[in-house]
C-alpha cells in the first residue's frame, strides 16, 4: 500500500473516501445530491452477491452424502449455524427467516471483507479504465446500510401484520406499554422504538466499517517500513470486527422479526 506522490495526505484520504457517482437527473458522473447512485457500491455488492449465490449453487450441485469436501463442510456448518441461531430466537416457521439470516451474514461478511483488500488495488484498476474515484467497501457507504436496514424494517412490519392482523397490531400500538388511558404516549413510544431500529442497525455497521477503512487509508500514508507491521496488526483485529458486525446485523434482524412475530 502506498500513497500517490501527486496528492497531499488530505487529498489522498479524500480521494479514497469518494464514490464513483451517477447523477440520476441527467445520468452524468456528477453529484446529484439525493438523486445520486454510488456505482462502486452497486457494482461490488452485486458482484459479491452473485459470487455468494454461484458458490452455494455449485457446492449444492456437487454435494454428496458419502465424503463431503472442504467447501461442502464449510457451507453445511454455515447453514447449520444460521439455522441454529434462528431456532433459538424465532419460534415460528423458519422457512423464510433461516435462509434470510444466512444470506445476510454471508453477504455482509463478504462486503465487509473488501476492507481487507489493499486500499490502492481496486481504485487503481478502475483508474486505468478512466474512473477517477472508486470506493470498494460497500458497507462503508451509508446508502447501502440504510437500504438493508429499511428492508429489515419492512419485513418487521410485514410480520407484525401477518401474525397479529391489522386490528391486533392496532390494539398493541394503542395500549402498550402504559394502557389504554395513555394512548397518545403509547403511539409516540412505539414510533420512536420502531424508528430507532433501522437507524441504529444501519449506523452501527456503517460506522465500524467506515472507521476501519479510514484507518487502513491512514496506514497507507505511513513510511513503507511501518506499513506492513501496522497493516498486519490492524488486519488481524479488523478480521474479528468484520465477522462480529456481520453476525450482529444478522442477529438483530432475527430478533426484530421474532419480536414482531410474537402474537399477544
UniProtKB/Swiss-Prot annotation:
Keywords: ATP synthesis, Cell inner membrane, Cell membrane, CF(0), Hydrogen ion transport, Ion transport, Membrane, Transmembrane, Transmembrane helix, Transport. PROSITE patterns: ATPASE_A. It comes from the Bacteria. The chain crosses the membrane at residues 39-59, 97-117, 139-159, 205-225, 239-259. CDD domains: ATP-synt_Fo_a_6. It is found in: Cell inner membrane. It is a multi-pass membrane protein. InterPro entries: ATP_syn_F0_a_bact/chloroplast, ATP_synth_F0_asu, ATP_synth_F0_asu_AS, F0_ATP_A_sf. Its main location: membrane. F-type ATPases have 2 components, CF(1) - the catalytic core - and CF(0) - the membrane proton channel. CF(1) has five subunits: alpha(3), beta(3), gamma(1), delta(1), epsilon(1). CF(0) has three main subunits: a(1), b(2) and c(9-12). The alpha and beta chains form an alternating ring which encloses part of the gamma chain. CF(1) is attached to CF(0) by a central stalk formed by the gamma and epsilon chains, while a peripheral stalk is formed by the delta and b chains. Key component of the proton channel; it plays a direct role in the translocation of protons across the membrane. Belongs to the ATPase A chain family. This is ATP synthase subunit a. The lineage of its organism: Bacteria, Pseudomonadati, Pseudomonadota, Gammaproteobacteria, Legionellales. The gene is atpB.
Amino acid at each position: 500500500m502506498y500513497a500517490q506522490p501527486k496528492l497531499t495526505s488530505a487529498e489522498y484520504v479524500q480521494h479514497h473516501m469518494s464514490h464513483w457517482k451517477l447523477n440520476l437527473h441527467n445520468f452524468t458522473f456528477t453529484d446529484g445530491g439525493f438523486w445520486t447512485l454510488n456505482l462502486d457500491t452497486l457494482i461490488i455488492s452485486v458482484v459479491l452477491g452473485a459470487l455468494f449465490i454461484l458458490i452455494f449453487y455449485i457446492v449444492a450441485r456437487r454435494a454428496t452424502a458419502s465424503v463431503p469436501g472442504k467447501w461442502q463442510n464449510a457451507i453445511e456448518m454455515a447453514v447449520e449455524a444460521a439455522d441454529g441461531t434462528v431456532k433459538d430466537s424465532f419460534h415460528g416457521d423458519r422457512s423464510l427467516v433461516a435462509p434470510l439470516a444466512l444470506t445476510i451474514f454471508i453477504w455482509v461478511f463478504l462486503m465487509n471483507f473488501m476492507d481487507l483488500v489493499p486500499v490502492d488495488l481496486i481504485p487503481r484498476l478502475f483508474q486505468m479504465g478512466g474512473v477517477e474515484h472508486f470506493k470498494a467497501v460497500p458497507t462503508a457507504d451509508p446508502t447501502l446500510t440504510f437500504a438493508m436496514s429499511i428492508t429489515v424494517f419492512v419485513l418487521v412490519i410485514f410480520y407484525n401484520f401477518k401474525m397479529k392482523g391489522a386490528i391486533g397490531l392496532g390494539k398493541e400500538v394503542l395500549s402498550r406499554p402504559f394502557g389504554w388511558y395513555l394512548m397518545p404516549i403509547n403511539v409516540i413510544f412505539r414510533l420512536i422504538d420502531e424508528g430507532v431500529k433501522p437507524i441504529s442497525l444501519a449506523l452501527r455497521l456503517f460506522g465500524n466499517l467506515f472507521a476501519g477503512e479510514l484507518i487502513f487509508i491512514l496506514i497507507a500514508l505511513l513510511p513503507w517500513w511501518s506499513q506492513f507491521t501496522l497493516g498486519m496488526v490492524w488486519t488481524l483485529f479488523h478480521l474479528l470486527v468484520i465477522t462480529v458486525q456481520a453476525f450482529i446485523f444478522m442477529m438483530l434482524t432475527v430478533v426484530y422479526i421474532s419480536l414482531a412475530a410474537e402474537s399477544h
